Amino acid sequence: MLKKVLLSGVKPTGAPHIGNYFGAMKQFVDLQKEYQGYVFIADYHALNFIQDKKEMEKNILGVLLDYLAIGLDPEKITMFKQSDISEHTELAWIFDTITTMPYLKRAHAFKDAEVKNKEICVGTFNYPMLMAADILLYSPDVVPVGLDQKQHVEYARDTAEKFNRIFGETFELPEPMIMKEVAVVPGTDGRKMSKSYNNHIPLFAEYEEIKKRVMGIVTDSGEGIPKNVYAIHKLFRNEDELKKIYKEKEGKYKELKETLIEDMEKFIAPMREKRKEFAKDIPKALEILKAGNKRAKEIASKKMKEVKDKIGVNIN
């Protein structure tokens, strides 16, 4: 029986933290067992806020190494780079021609930029159409998203329906896979973990950095069980075991943090070492991306030919 198709994109925005892992990255690894997956590095989307050659190159390679290190299997998941598949921007332009400005003004990213009084670039305004192209080229059954990202898939569905209505049935309508059960990981200060708050713990951190970050977790001196420590700790150990440990060491914050450090190190170390191994042979890692690009190109070019036939530009 053919597996259903799953697609997702990852913006190359820098080194991931454990919040990124438990909030999204881990799910891709889990889902690869039951889906035919496509995961692309969304480097053109990243151009809206990264306009430095060296940073972009470093981040793109970083995403590739990160996902290989956490267990993404190139035999099960096609990993490719958005900018290497020209059909993405080509289809986005075609979608632009059937999309109105008022419709794009409803996008969350545009509204956020307006509220912050930012100078809004055309890339930010137009990004829903590039995202629609990213999705619709591969006819996925599902697109994993958080509740706050559901609009991405809704834009793709609306665009597919409009194109189909104008030019005839061409695109399938993808379904959002709402990741309701994913963890919202607290940072070291109790707020949601984020690099912008500097309250994060890097996913591939060395032992000394893990120790420094965990020891810096904010605790309330009036608590018997430090809730910020516990909220992070339950990601790394069975909760029944944790309850016993936290009861035995109630009020002993330093000891509880030391236990978290050891549990976190046991979890992170294998992935950290695996990433180092991939980083020793960059050409080999790039071959994986090259193979993924080839597979993605075959699918995208086939769909693009169908689109061109429908809109009437294939006259030769």
Regions flagged by a language model, labelled:
Residues L2-A133:
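N-terminal Rossmann-like or analogous alpha/beta NTP/dinucleotide-binding catalytic cores
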Residues P12, V143-P144, N199:
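A generic structural motif
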Residues N20, Q151, R157-N316:
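Conserved nucleotide- and phosphate/pyrophosphate-binding catalytic cores
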Residues I41-L47, L136-D141, K274-A279:
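A short small-residue
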Residues L64, G71, T99-P102, P140, ...:
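A generic secondary-structure signal for well-formed alpha-helical elements
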Residues M101-K105, L137-P144, R237-I245:
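Short helix-capping/linker segments at secondary-structure and domain boundaries
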Residues A109-F163, F167:
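Internal, conserved structured core segments that host functional sites
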